[in-house]
């Protein structure tokens, strides 16, 4: 290769590297601005134990992205995502009937006066979420993946079929799209015990999550230790006062294959 082509190739690589660094900095600035923005007092109180900056950076969310907040509940992360992705992006605030009933009034308050103009609520059965193919860049599960195996009182079945849910999300994600899952760690759990553990303890075995995503067509793309905590008792419910808001949590990232 002659020197002219070498210089051109080197310049191209340098420019690509600069673009990557610049885009990462742009995304980080958007995340910092979202966290520092005027938000609800209760949200701010939760920042210390939720560590949203670490979670959102790990999600690699950036302005212009289209994101789904799975089982958003009252919308703590929905609001942050809305502010990060900005007017050229969008956020789907997804809940099923049970989650919507529990969070309805808080979401009304959060969305009043079109506070989050780029966010929309979507309420639908978990196994049949109506999403357009290749419409999402990112999906976020925060302390809710175990609920796919949770068995509501009086129900003969768990809340959802994990494979149906993940395959729908796989279809809805663009090529290379990312999913981040944050959840409370359970001991290694046989498949036949998953429903019991999820229902009684609200935890899940991280190995099960990896296996579920692999089966649904995702590749494991890394993990963060930002929410790991020593001293958690995996045998008690996450709502037990001895561990509440101090549970040992995994943060996994998966990429659509």
Language model features: what each stretch is:
Residues 31-58, 62:
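Class I SAM-dependent methyltransferase Rossmann-like catalytic core
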Residues 64-73:
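Conserved class I S-adenosyl-L-methionine
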Residues 103-129:
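S-adenosyl-L-methionine
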Residues 129-139, 143:
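A short acidic, Gly/Pro-enriched loop at the edge of an enzyme's catalytic core
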Residues 192-220:
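Conserved Class I S-adenosyl-L-methionine
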Residues 216, 231-257:
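Core SAM-dependent methyltransferase catalytic element
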């Amino acid at each position: 290769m002659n020197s002219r082509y070498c210089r051109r190739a080197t310049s191209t690589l340098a420019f690509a590297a600069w673009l990557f660094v610049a885009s990462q900095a742009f995304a980080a600035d958007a995340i910092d601005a979202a966290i520092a923005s005027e938000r609800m007092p209760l949200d701010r109180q939760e920042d210390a134990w939720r560590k949203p900056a670490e979670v959102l950076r790990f999600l690699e969310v950036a302005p212009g992205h289209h994101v789904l907040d799975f089982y958003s509940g009252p919308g703590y992360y929905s609001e942050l995502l809305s502010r990060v992705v900005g007017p050229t992006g969008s956020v789907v605030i997804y809940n099923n009937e049970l989650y919507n009933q529990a969070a309805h009034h808080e979401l009304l308050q959060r969305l009043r006066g079109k506070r989050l103009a780029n966010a929309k609520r979507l309420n639908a059965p978990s196994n049949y979420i109506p999403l357009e193919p290749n419409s999402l860049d990112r999906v976020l599960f925060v302390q809710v993946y175990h609920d796919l195996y949770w068995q509501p009182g009086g129900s003969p079945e768990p809340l959802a079929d994990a494979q149906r849910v993940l395959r729908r999300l796989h279809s809805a994600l663009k090529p290379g799209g990312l999913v981040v899952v944050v959840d409370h760690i359970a001991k290694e759990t046989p498949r036949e015990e998953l429903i019991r553990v999820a229902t009684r303890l609200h935890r899940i075995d991280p190995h099960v999550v990896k296996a579920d995503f692999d089966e649904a067509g995702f590749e494991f793309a890394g993990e963060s230790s930002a929410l790991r905590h020593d001293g958690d008792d995996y045998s008690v419910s996450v709502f037990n006062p001895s561990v509440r808001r101090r549970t040992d949590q995994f943060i996994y990232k998966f990429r659509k294959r």
